[in-house]
Design a protein with these regions (language model features):
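Short beta-strand immediately N-terminal to the catalytic nucleophile in serine-hydrolase-like folds
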Residues: 60-62, 87
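Active-site signature of alpha/beta-hydrolase-fold catalytic machinery across serine-
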Residues: 21, 49, 72-76
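Flexible "cap/lid" loop of the alpha/beta hydrolase fold
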Residues: 75-76, 80-124
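Conserved HGGG/HGGXW glycine-rich cap/lid loop of the alpha/beta-hydrolase fold
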Residues: 1-47, 58-59
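Gly/Ala-rich beta-loop-alpha elbow adjacent to hydrolase catalytic centers
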Residues: 62-66, 70
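Conserved alpha/beta-hydrolase catalytic His-Asp/Glu region
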Residues: 98-102, 116-175
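Active-site acidic short loop of glycosyltransferases
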Residues: 3, 54-56, 79, 176
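Short N-terminal helix/helix-N-cap motif within the alpha/beta-hydrolase-1
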Residues: 16-18, 95, 169
C-alpha cells in the first residue's frame, strides 16, 4: 500500500535542488512534491499557500526556513499532517534587543549584496558561512547551491528575510 504524499518544504532561497539527492529514497512508494514559496513574505502565508495546494492528508518535511513553514502548517491544520520532519531549524521568534538587531543587520547586509551585485554574488558570500569548510572545495556542490540561489530574485530574498525576521514563536506547536 502506498504511503500518503510527502510535501518537501525548502529553506531560504532554496528550491527543488536541495531535495534532489534524497528524492530517490523519499519517493519510494509515495508521491513527493517540493513547494515554492513564491513571493510570500510571512511564514503563515507560505503555510497557507502550501495547504491550499496540498491533498487532504500528507506527510511533511521542512528544511531550515521550510521547517518553520512546516511548523505553521501544523499550527493551522494539524489534522491534515500525518507526520512531520523538521531539519536544521529553530522554533523561537527573533530575539529581542541587540541579538535580534544583529540578526536583522546580517540578513539586510546580504540583501544589499543581492540588490547591488546580484543574487550570485550574495550566494557566494552566504555559502562561506553555511557550507562546512571541508566541503567548500567541492566545486559541484558549491555550483549547485549558487545555481539554486540564482533562480530566485532579490525581491524573493527580501520577502523571505521579512518572513524570517517576523517569525512567530512555535514553542506551542512543538508542545502540542
Amino acid at each position: 500500500m502506498p504511503h500518503e504524499p510527502l510535501i518537501l518544504v525548502p529553506g531560504l532561497m532554496c528550491d527543488h535542488a536541495v531535495w534532489e539527492p534524497l528524492l530517490p529514497a523519499l519517493a519510494t512508494g509515495r508521491h513527493c512534491t517540493v513547494v515554492d514559496h513564491g513571493h510570500a513574505n510571512s511564514l503563515v502565508t507560505m503555510a497557507q499557500q502550501l495547504l491550499d495546494a496540498a491533498p487532504a492528508r500528507f506527510a511533511l518535511a521542512g528544511h531550515s526556513m521550510g521547517a518553520r513553514v512546516a511548523l505553521e502548517v501544523v499550527r493551522l491544520a494539524p489534522q491534515r499532517v500525518s507526520r512531520v520532519a523538521l531539519l536544521d531549524t529553530g522554533y523561537l521568534p527573533r530575539a529581542a534587543g541587540a541579538a535580534g538587531e544583529e540578526e536583522a543587520a546580517k540578513r539586510y547586509a546580504l540583501l544589499k549584496v543581492a540588490q547591488e551585485q546580484g543574487v550570485r554574488a550574495m550566494a557566494q558570500v552566504w555559502v562561506q558561512g553555511m557550507v562546512h569548510p571541508a566541503r567548500l572545495g567541492d566545486v559541484e556542490l558549491v555550483e549547485r547551491i549558487l545555481a539554486m540561489f540564482t533562480r530566485k530574485s532579490p525581491e524573493v530574498f527580501a520577502a523571505q528575510i521579512t518572513a524570517l525576521l517576523t517569525r512567530p514563536d512555535a514553542s506551542d506547536v512543538l508542545r502540542s
